[in-house]
Amino acid sequence: MQKTLEKNHTIPMENHIDARNEGLPFNTKFFDAININRSAVEKRVATLTGRRSVKKEFQAAWLLKAISMIDLTTLAGDDTRGNVLRLCEKAKNPVREDLLAQLGMQDAKLTTGAVCVYHNLIPFAKEALQGTSIPIAAVSTGFPAGKISLEDKISEIKKSVAAGAKEIDIVISRDLVL
């Protein structure tokens, strides 16, 4: 498999770890059509520190919404089945019942957005989250450095999906970007 970077310049994908990303030359044409009203920007910036982004009566609702979008993640090198099971219980019940009751949200069925684990821990998360709608996310593709071949990355993604992951957090090869 070959990927063409520029005319007459190809890099075999199986050796992509050794490839160097030459980047692109800076081109200002993308900014030529942008007009900025400097005084309006300065006026807006001056008001930012004195304003709250969310009014007090809506803060709890926004915080609960944020909880529903969080991926609870455990990516410790010594993760165990027990760690994953505890994390999944927290994902199913992220806020104490008494606090939800004070907010009138006791029937909201609040959960986090997902639980993220290493590929080898997917079965434990799947077991703990059975019967819920909480998706499992897996870090695949050689986390954290991404220093495995493209073929191995694709294989690991396929295995993670087959094991039950609904979301895949991928790691790009940093040396291709930097």
Region locations from a protein language model:
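Alpha/beta enzyme core
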Residues: 57-67, 78-110, 120-178
